[in-house]
Amino acid sequence: MSSKLVLVLNCGSSSLKFAIIDAINGEEYLSGLAECFNLPEARIKWKMDGGKHDAELGAGAAHSEALNFIVNTILSQKPELSAQLVAIGHRIVHGGEKFTQSAIITDDVLQGIKDSVPFAPLHNPAHLIGIEEALKSFPHLADKNVAVFDTAFHQTMPEESYLYALPYKLYKENHIRRYGFHGTSHYFVSREAAKVLNKPVEELNVITCHLGNGGSVTAIRNGECVDTSMGLTPLEGLVMGTRCGDIDPAVIFHLHDALGMDVASINKLLTKESGLQGLTEVTSDCRYVEDNYETKADAKRAMDVYCHRLAKYIGSYSALMEGRLDAVIFTGGIGENAAMVRELSLKKLGLLGFDVDHERNLAARFGKGGNIAKDGTRPALVIPTNEELVIAEDAYRLTA
């Protein structure tokens, strides 16, 4: 076992994903998820040494109890894992304009994460709790905690991409602009694509589609992000599981003025009750939409709107490629597994030279990637993402 092990923590508002990864060879020694925080059914499940395990955390348990369980129950069974830890990597959703790359966590970095709380009110406070608990649980690694920001990869966007057409002082004084998210995933799959296409990263022109319960598309030119679909928050852009993505902002005024909804109710509607959930009025699960596309009107409606929006973004981002698009890339839970989403979306993009091979497309799922396009047509790559590995690599690189 290597002494290059990194504990990777991804703290959500009601969950904590964790893993222990060898930062050099990518081997995963432990992975798990603690969820349903602050509820009676709070629980934790994990994989270690080829076995799957789960346990109750106790009613009302949250981040502190989950980390205590990881340290005192899981790692106590395998003390050599704890002994080999050299760093802790934290996924941070929003780093604002301050962070263009990963950073060792100092008081200044903590303040920067706090300053971005208004733009990520569910995520950043949870990240801060995770950092605080990690410092308590692993005091010997106090100066080896690293923040890896979802927003960092998008900081290469030019002004014409990140500015909204609002009074300029709102940007200068209040930092209201496009930031973008899923940056770690877009970064990882673009680097993997460079290997597949046998091109130097700095010459790579691709459009990456991270499609999960949240989803975003990124235009990458010469290896750098030049535009992305999510905005100030992760609400803008694509149709998502429960988020609406792009809408006319005046819809909000109509909901308030004509339907009498208050701001909190409108926020809940747009973030928790829209997207696939809203269009089907049944579920946010894309598998339902795929399975019932031919037989249920709600599933067809949701899938058609979803793929229309996705194709529109890919098409518009092709205009930013300066005449050369090397490939489109699909990743994330939906991007890696939903063959129908890929096929229906790319079918709309024949003008760009995409032509899907039906059998290759069906075969690319459950961790199996590859080029799903017919020979001689523009590549469409399915590449499983590995955000945890990027976080581990960055944490090790900065602290070694």
Curated annotation (Swiss-Prot):
It catalyses: acetate + ATP = acetyl phosphate + ADP. Its cofactor is Mg(2+); Mn(2+). GO terms for cellular component: cytosol. GO terms for molecular function: acetate kinase activity; ATP binding; magnesium ion binding. It is found in: Cytoplasm. Keywords: ATP-binding, Cytoplasm, Kinase, Magnesium, Metal-binding, Nucleotide-binding, Transferase. It comes from the Bacteria. The record marks 182, 243 as: Transition state stabilizer. One of its GO terms (biological process) is acetyl-CoA biosynthetic process. The active site is at residue 150. Mg(2+) binds at residues 10, 387. Disulfide bonds: none annotated. Signal peptide: none annotated. Its main location: cytoplasm. Its EC number is 2.7.2.1. Catalyzes the formation of acetyl phosphate from acetate and ATP. Can also catalyze the reverse reaction. PANTHER family: ACETATE KINASE (PTHR21060:SF21). This is Acetate kinase. It comes from Pectobacterium carotovorum subsp. carotovorum (strain PC1). The gene is ackA.
